Regions:
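C-terminal substrate-binding subdomain of Rossmann-fold SDR/epimerase-dehydratase oxidoreductases
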Residues: 16, 61, 76, 80-176
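Active-site proximal helix/loop that lines the substrate pocket
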Residues: 3-8, 61-67, 95, 129
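Hydrophobic structural elements of the Rossmann-like NAD(P)H-binding subdomain
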Residues: 1-2, 57, 78
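Acidic pyrophosphate-coordinating catalytic loop
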Residues: 67-68, 159
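Catalytic helix-loop patch of NAD(P)-dependent Rossmann-fold dehydrogenases
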Residues: 5-56, 68-71
Length: 179
């Protein structure tokens, strides 16, 4: 499995699979982003050289049960902070966007991709984009918390927008998010 991180801080929005990305190879996020890009390149090379069936899925922000609280992802961080009445921490101004996909929708897409004939990368995720500040407010409302929102500096290389173009997934009948 690959990731939307292969797009880096994208200059194209939403991100189609044909977009090569905007990754800073020596930036703080570079190791992860480039490792996923390298894995895609090796997968395609192996497919071409050895005629092995392969699939590449670029997974966008996924959430669901059993997420680790301290893994650095925004969903468990916000929920944990809201449950403990700690400030909900937003990095930057909260204008950066993400598209959140429930894990059951992702699994459905993975199964469909596995059964398809598609050999090139496919984006899997929810095409509905949400500002991080709006997401924090939604968590406050759903959790019924008094947790204030706190703002901290945006880490360098943090993507400003993240939204999958899922037209290819729809075209090859892999599906889209329902939850």
């Amino acid at each position: 499995a690959s990731t939307s991180e292969v797009y880096g801080d994208p200059l194209v929005h939403p991100q189609p699979e044909t977009y090569w990305g905007n990754v800073n190879p020596i930036g703080p996020r570079g190791c992860y982003d480039e490792a996923k890009r390298f894995a895609e390149a090796m997968t395609m090379a192996y497919h071409r050289e050895h005629k092995v069936e392969t699939r590449i899925v670029r997974i966008f922000n996924t959430y669901g049960p059993r997420m680790r609280i301290n893994d650095g992802r925004v969903v468990p961080a916000f929920v944990s902070q809201a449950l403990t009445n700690k400030p909900i921490t937003i990095f930057g101004k909260g204008t950066q966007t993400r598209s959140f996909c429930y894990v059951s929708d992702l699994v459905d897409g993975l199964v469909r991709l596995g059964k398809s004939d598609e050999r090139f990368p496919v984006n899997l995720g929810n095409p509905v984009e949400l500002k991080i500040s709006e997401f924090a407010e939604r968590i406050q409302r759903l959790m019924g918390t008094n947790s204030p929102i706190s703002y901290k500096p945006l880490p360098s290389d943090d993507p400003k927008q993240r939204q999958p173009d899922i037209s290819k997934a729809a075209r090859v009948q892999i599906g889209r998010a329902h939850v």
